[in-house]
């Protein structure tokens, strides 16, 4: 998941002097405003509307900040032209500090407070006005901080520059089709257009505003919060943001600086006022001064004037201030045309228009008085409209006060009006004194609502404020001032006829003859007078009232459901329908036909508003239709709700004493007949109730409701996010939302287990924490690399210190030379004079030829040395011819020994393919073809004779030693390794001598043994007769200090590093023991010597069991069986049975090359599996005379070294490895990762030859390569499992290199 980096708005450049002067002047003006700066509801609303209207364009400039300098965000107030760094500061300034009008100019296309507008007017206005801003500083000049990029003008503010740039329409060719704004680049215009059409996924839960960015939503949410958690520690003033508080603290900081300065000038005055800088000698005088002149800075002052920001300590001082400072202001009564000079006089006069509450514990005083009190506290300087008193009295807001009525000595007495008492009193008459109490604290001695409102606004300003609802259109207003303006502009013509006092417009109580001017007064009267426990309403009515809210219902079940839902109560008293006293004609009230509790509304407009908001604009049920088509529910309401009917303007029927029926136009002379007639209408309509959708009739309202629910019920499945509670219509949308919003990509360091949230962070971490430097020390004479300086010193001591003038030594004759070129020229004098009689290999020295004969051809007779290098051996006197015998030896697959400790790069048992140009030999024809193509540029199939000399001469890479030429640099590099000889990297820890391989070092270390001629175990003193007993004793006496193998030689007590080294010790000690025993015994008795057949490698106790043959001057011994098969023309047939006292070993099937332990098993195998073969045809397949029988091809897993017979099995096995272990393979030596075991093996080979000058030597045949992958390919092609040197002590696996063993131990056998 990626998220684009959001732009940060750039701060506006302001001069230091200008900023300090503005801060001081601004904080002084704000300090004078006192605590009223957070209570202006008008400003809050304007800020909220400002934010909502510009939520789209406020995002654009922050995104454009990444590309264009002209699109950097700036926030400027459109009234006072002050710039701000963030939208939060601008919103706080507009809501609480801006001295200008809070209303936005509707003619501007972008509001000035939006960051997208940049205080820029509409482009059409700018072009029409000619950029005449009307101010001198906005016209621009020269040398100002913000120059125009299109002309020579510069401006003092960035906002002026943005306005000016819009006139350069030729330089801004891209125009927004939505708001006509101009842009310099198309990408800016396209990104801006997306803000008009893009999705806003961040919605405000308080209002319907939506934003495209989360930070814009956070800024917008601050406009809904009235809390100011940041308090000034000096003046206790609250702020909504830290930036506003810091700006305010600058004023106190300057006051402290002036205080320090004044203290130095006048040391006698110790106390100074923080507001006016007056000094006093005592704290009492300072406190008195603050209480008198600056009460807003005093902690004791908690009462604020409703007309101005002045704060006072007690009520008497506040009232005195109101009479003195605001005595000339006239206040009009909202109920009548009278005016008063003081607010208190208005409140006292309003008592004449209300009936006082019956209990001081009521939390709902008279709606008229409570609403007017709330109005006057919100807008004290505004003259209330006469309509406001009536409209506000119908609002649903509950005043924040409780009224306590005092009458005589019993303040809690219930005031019950007499039946014949007049409701409208004169102005001179007044009720008993009303005492008001605070609903939030224990104060109960407020003489008027004005004092109570002042107390609530100052002491309990953090309490939630009530909303005010218009009773005509049901719109909610934040303050009564807004409600007054709303009614005056929109509903003034509708409000007067309804709310005006007169003889023909009043509300009649159905329980008593009382009449009221508004429906709220009627509800209050019913709740007080007729809802008590002792009230006994008349019986026999079919309508019911709620005793808590005085709402009427048609059925008892509707009333019960209303009480449970609205008042969370089940035990409330139900009020039955009162008796109607018709003295005048009535007007109908309206009920919602779709609500279960059937609420009643006073006008069709209110009912329409209710249905539009709650029932999706369903048409009204009681429209002008015939009586048969009307809804039963609405008809029921119209008939059975005379309890809430209004009086009509005509009084003719009432004056005649008649009671007209509003359903059938009948008239009755007495009320009893009229009531009985209405019950007939009610019973007739309640018999059957029809569905308003399908006209189906139902017997009960419950069945009708259950049926009607089906028409409006739809089911849908939504998928909700558990984190943010957002709903989605499909699972795909939910998953996309979870991936986009609730998914994080983390980066895990496998070296130290730390987690990072970005790729850049982990790259920095790896570069700082895990990048270790490693120094290498190189010898300038031989270019060898060493990790430690001590190793280089030892190398110099043994290699270059003895003869510093001649540091290069010949490995054949020991002669030294001063330069490498002289050594290479000298090496050319050593030609390969000594040839092998069996495989045509040539060697530089006789010792190398003898070693080759012992290891490859099992020839240990020193008589072979007697023959010359190029001499012809004597012919054999036996039956078998030398040529046939040599062919038999070459064809036998078991004739050669293992490849261990071989110096040659080609196995003699494999076919040889020689290059007739340079003499290079290869085991495969493909390798020879690659060699000819790479080094001699001869393609397969071309005539070698015609191209041989020409292509040989064309080689551009020439060897400086032997003058041979090559076509590639790699071929020349590989050829040069043959002149340099094997590199000696293995040093003897006893004498310091170096050897080219670990095998030669092991053979050398044996010569340092002090127990050369002893064949006994030095631990248990038991004699050792064979190599098997030696190995068994070494396993019986393990070396716990040896962490590699766990073994040591029990004869010489040397520590061995591999199983191969242990076998070499056993062979060496047993051969010395056999030689010493034979020399010490006069009769030649002692350890019995075994003799092997040169063809089948069978062992015999007596030399007489073998027939001696001389082939090319070398003696060989063949058993009788091999001689018989040779005479019959067979090769490799069944061998004769071995002597009974010793089991035979090394029996193989000539057809499938399977090895058996005994001759009986081999014979049984031949009869079962190769029955069709006759003895004459049971020999091996005929082939070339120089090629033996090919071995069966097998496949070995590099990972676990398991062998498989076909390619499919190895593929399935490798696939299982990948499923179980994955495709990543780690090198435990350096923690690098590879995607295949072959690459890991190649990497481990590089570890083995670190610091070796870039050469790689085969540990088996010592062939030198310049690339590790070439050596790896060579090992796979030439050497097998039996040639591996290092054995794992904990499992049967073997390895060619020690680094392979170390990596295997750390990965598979780590504790």
UniProtKB/Swiss-Prot annotation:
Keyword hit for Nucleotide-binding: no
Stored Gene3D superfamilies: Classic Zinc Finger
Pfam families: zf-C2H2 (PF00096), zf-C2H2_6 (PF13912)
One function term, GO molecular function aspect: sequence-specific DNA binding
Keyword field: Activator, Developmental protein, Differentiation, DNA-binding, Metal-binding, Neurogenesis, Nucleus, Phosphoprotein, Repeat, Repressor, Transcription, Transcription regulation, Zinc, Zinc-finger
Polar residues composition bias: residue spans: 110-123, 373-382
Signal sequence coordinates: none
A cellular component annotation (GO) from this entry: nucleus
GO biological process: brown fat cell differentiation; cerebellar granule cell precursor proliferation; cilium assembly; negative regulation of cold-induced thermogenesis; negative regulation of DNA-templated transcription; Notch signaling pathway; positive regulation of BMP signaling pathway; positive regulation of DNA-templated transcription
Biased composition (Basic residues): 1-11
Transmembrane domains' residue ranges: none
Region (Disordered): 1-21, 34-70, 95-123, 354-426, 617-654, 1163-1190
PROSITE patterns reported for this sequence: ZINC_FINGER_C2H2_1, ZINC_FINGER_C2H2_2
SUPFAM superfamilies: beta-beta-alpha zinc fingers
Annotated zinc fingers (C2H2-type), start-end: 75-101, 146-168, 174-196, 202-224, 230-252, 271-294, 303-326, 331-353, 436-460, 468-491, 507-530, 544-567, 590-615, 659-681, 689-711, 719-742, 747-770, 777-800, 808-830, 834-857, 913-935, 957-979, 986-1008, 1047-1069, 1091-1109, 1147-1170, 1195-1217, 1225-1247, 1256-1279, 1286-1309
Biased composition (Low complexity): 390-404, 631-642
Comp. bias regions, Basic and acidic residues: 41-54, 1163-1174
Residues carrying Phosphoserine: 55, 58, 631, 1081
Similarity annotation: Belongs to the krueppel C2H2-type zinc-finger protein family.
PANTHER family reported for this sequence: BLOODY FINGERS-RELATED, KRAB AND ZINC FINGER DOMAIN-CONTAINING
Function: Transcription factor that can both act as an activator or a repressor depending on the context. Plays a central role in BMP signaling and olfactory neurogenesis. Associates with SMADs in response to BMP2 leading to activate transcription of BMP target genes. Acts as a transcriptional repressor via its interaction with EBF1, a transcription factor involved in terminal olfactory receptor neurons differentiation; this interaction preventing EBF1 to bind DNA and activate olfactory-specific genes.
Annotated domain remarks: Uses different DNA- and protein-binding zinc fingers to regulate the distinct BMP-Smad and Olf signaling pathways. C2H2-type zinc fingers 14-19 mediate the interaction with SMAD1 and SMAD4, while zinc fingers 28-30 mediate the interaction with EBF1. zinc fingers 2-8 bind the 5'-CCGCCC-3' DNA sequence in concert with EBF1, while zinc fingers 9-13 bind BMP target gene promoters in concert with SMADs.
Subunit description: Homodimer. Interacts with PARP1, SMAD1 and SMAD4. Interacts with EBF1. Interacts with CEP290.
Name of the protein in question: Zinc finger protein 423
Top-level taxonomy: Eukaryota, Metazoa, Chordata, Craniata, Vertebrata
Gene designation per UniProt: Znf423
């Amino acid at each position: 998941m990626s998220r684009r980096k959001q732009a940060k708005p750039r701060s506006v450049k302001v001069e230091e002097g200008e900023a300090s002067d503005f801060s001081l002047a601004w904080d002084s003006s704000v300090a004078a405003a006192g605590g009223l700066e957070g209570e202006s509801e008008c400003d809050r609303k304007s800020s909220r509307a400002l934010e909502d209207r510009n939520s789209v364009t406020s995002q654009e400039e922050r995104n454009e900040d990444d590309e264009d300098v002209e699109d950097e965000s700036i926030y400027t107030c459109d009234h006072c032209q002050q710039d701000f760094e963030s939208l939060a500061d601008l919103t706080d300034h507009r809501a609480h500090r801006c001295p200008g009008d809070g209303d936005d100019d509707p003619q501007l296309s972008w509001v000035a407070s939006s960051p997208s507008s940049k205080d820029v007017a509409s482009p059409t206005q700018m072009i029409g006005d000619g950029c005449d801003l009307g101010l001198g500083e906005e016209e621009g000049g020269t040398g100002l901080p913000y120059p125009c990029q299109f002309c020579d003008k510069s401006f003092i503010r960035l906002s002026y520059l943005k306005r000016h740039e819009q006139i350069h329409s030729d330089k801004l060719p891209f125009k927004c089709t939505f708001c006509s704004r101009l842009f310099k680049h198309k990408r800016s215009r396209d990104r801006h257009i997306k803000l008009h059409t893009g999705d806003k996924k961040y919605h405000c839960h308080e209002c319907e505003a939506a934003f495209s960015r989360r930070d814009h939503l956070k800024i917008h949410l601050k406009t809904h919060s009235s809390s100011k958690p940041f308090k000034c520690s000096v003046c206790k003033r609250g702020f909504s943001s830290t930036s506003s508080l810091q700006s305010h603290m600058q004023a106190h900081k300057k006051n402290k600086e002036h205080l320090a300065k004044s203290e130095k000038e006048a040391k006698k005055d110790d106390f100074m006022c923080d507001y006016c800088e007056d000094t006093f000698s005592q704290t009492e005088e300072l406190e008195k001064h603050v209480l008198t002149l600056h009460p807003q800075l005093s902690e004791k002052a908690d009462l604020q004037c409703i007309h101005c920001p002045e704060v006072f300590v007690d009520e008497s001082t506040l009232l005195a201030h109101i009479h003195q400072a605001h005595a000339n202001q006239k206040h009009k009564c909202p109920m009548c045309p009278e005016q008063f000079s003081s607010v208190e006089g208005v409140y006292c006069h309003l008592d004449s228009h209300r009936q006082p509450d019956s209990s001081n514990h009521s939390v709902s005083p008279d709606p008229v008085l409570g609403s007017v009190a709330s109005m006057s506290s919100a807008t004290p300087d505004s003259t209330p409209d006469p309509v406001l008193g009536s409209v506000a009295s119908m609002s649903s807001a509950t005043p924040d006060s409780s009224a306590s009525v005092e009458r005589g000595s019993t303040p809690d007495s219930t005031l019950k009006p007499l039946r014949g008492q007049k409701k409208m009193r004169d102005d001179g008459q007044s009720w008993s004194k009303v005492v008001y109490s605070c609903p939030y604290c224990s104060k109960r001695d407020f003489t008027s609502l004005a004092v109570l409102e002042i107390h609530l606004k100052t002491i309990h300003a953090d309490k939630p404020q009530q909303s005010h609802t218009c009773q005509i259109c049901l719109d909610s207003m934040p303050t009564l001032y807004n409600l007054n303006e709303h009614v005056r502009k929109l509903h003034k013509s509708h409000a007067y006829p309804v709310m005006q006092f007169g003889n023909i417009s009043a509300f009649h109580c159905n329980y008593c003859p009382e009449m009221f001017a508004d429906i709220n007064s009627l509800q209050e009267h019913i709740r007080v007078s007729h809802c008590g426990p002792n009230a006994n309403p008349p019986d026999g009515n079919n309508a019911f009232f709620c005793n808590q809210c005085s709402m009427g219902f048609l059925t008892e079940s509707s009333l019960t459901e209303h009480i449970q839902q609205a008042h969370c109560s089940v035990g409330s008293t139900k009020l039955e329908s009162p008796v109607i006293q018709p003295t005048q004609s009535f007007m109908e009230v309206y009920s919602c036909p779709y609500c279960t509790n059937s609420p009643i509304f006073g006008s069709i407009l209110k009912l329409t508003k209710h249905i539009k908001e709650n029932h999706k604009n369903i048409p009204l049920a009681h429209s002008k239709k015939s009586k048969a088509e009307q809804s039963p529910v609405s008809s029921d309401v119209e008939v059975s709700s005379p309890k809430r009917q209004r009086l009509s303007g005509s009084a003719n029927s009432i004056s005649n004493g008649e009671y007209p029926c509003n359903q059938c136009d009948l008239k009755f002379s007495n009320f009893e007949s009229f009531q009985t007639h209405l019950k007939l209408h009610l019973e007739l309509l309640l018999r059957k109730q029809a569905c308003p959708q399908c006209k189906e009739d139902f017997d009960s309202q419950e069945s009708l409701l259950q049926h009607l629910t089906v028409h409006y019920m739809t089911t849908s499945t939504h998928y909700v996010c558990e984190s943010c509670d957002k709903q989605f219509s499909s699972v795909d949308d939910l998953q996309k939302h979870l991936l986009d919003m609730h998914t994080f990509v983390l980066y895990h360091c496998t070296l130290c287990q730390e987690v990072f949230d970005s790729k850049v962070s982990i790259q920095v971490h790896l570069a700082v924490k895990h990048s270790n430097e490693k120094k290498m020390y190189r010898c300038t004479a031989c270019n060898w690399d060493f990790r430690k300086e001590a190793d280089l010193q030892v190398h110099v001591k043994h290699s270059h210190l003895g003869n510093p003038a001649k540091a290069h030594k010949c490995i054949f004759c020991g002669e030294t030379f001063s330069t490498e070129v002289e050594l290479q020229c000298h090496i050319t004098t050593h030609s390969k004079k000594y040839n092998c009689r069996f495989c045509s290999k040539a060697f530089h020295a006789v010792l190398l030829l003898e070693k080759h004969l012992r290891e490859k051809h099992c020839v240990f007779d020193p008589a072979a040395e007697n023959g010359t290098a190029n001499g012809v051996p004597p012919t054999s006197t036996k039956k078998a011819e030398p040529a046939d015998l040599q062919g038999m030896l070459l064809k036998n697959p078991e004739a050669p020994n293992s490849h261990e400790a071989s110096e040659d790069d080609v196995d003699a048992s494999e076919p040889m393919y020689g290059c007739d140009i340079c003499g290079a030999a290869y085991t495969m024809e493909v390798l020879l073809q690659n060699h000819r193509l790479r080094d001699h540029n001869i393609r397969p199939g071309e005539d070698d004779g015609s191209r041989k000399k020409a292509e040989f001469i064309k080689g551009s890479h020439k060897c400086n030693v032997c003058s041979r030429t090559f076509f590639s640099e790699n071929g020349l590099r590989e050829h040069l390794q043959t002149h340099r000889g094997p590199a000696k990297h293995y040093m003897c820890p006893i004498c310091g001598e170096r050897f080219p391989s670990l095998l030669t070092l092991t053979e050398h270390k044996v010569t340092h043994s002090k127990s050369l001629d002893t064949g006994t175990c030095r631990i248990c003193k038991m004699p050792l007769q064979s190599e098997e007993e030696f190995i068994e004793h070494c396993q019986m006496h393990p070396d716990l200090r040896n962490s590699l193998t766990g073994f040591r030689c029990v004869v010489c007590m040397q520590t061995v590093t591999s199983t191969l080294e242990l076998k070499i010790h056993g062979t060496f000690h047993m051969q010395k023991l056999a030689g010493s025993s034979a020399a010490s015994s006069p009769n030649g008795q002692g350890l019995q010597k075994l003799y092997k057949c040169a063809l089948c490698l069978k062992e015999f106790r007596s030399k007489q069991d073998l027939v001696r043959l001389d082939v090319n001057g070398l003696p060989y011994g063949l058993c009788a069986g091999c001689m018989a098969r040779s005479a019959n023309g067979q090769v490799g047939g069944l061998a004769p049975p071995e002597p009974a006292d010793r089991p035979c070993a090394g029996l193989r099937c000539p057809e499938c090359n399977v090895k058996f332990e005994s001759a009986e098993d081999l014979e049984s195998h031949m009869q079962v599996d190769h029955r069709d073969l006759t003895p004459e045809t049971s020999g091996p397949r005929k082939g070339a005379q120089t090629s033996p029988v090919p071995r069966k091809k097998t496949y070995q897993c590099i990972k676990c070294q398991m062998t498989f017979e076909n390619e499919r099995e190895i593929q399935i096995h490798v696939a299982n490895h990948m499923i179980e272990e994955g495709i990543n393979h780690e090198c435990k030596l350096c923690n690098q990762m590879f995607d295949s075991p072959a690459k890991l093996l190649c990497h481990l080979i590089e570890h083995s030859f670190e610091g070796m000058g870039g050469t790689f030597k085969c540990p088996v045949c010592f062939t030198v390569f310049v690339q590790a992958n070439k050596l790896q390919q060579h090992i796979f092609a030439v050497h097998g499992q039996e040639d591996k040197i290092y054995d794992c002590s904990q499992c049967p696996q073997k390895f060619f290199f020690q680094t392979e063993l170390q990596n295997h131990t750390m990965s598979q056998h780590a504790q």
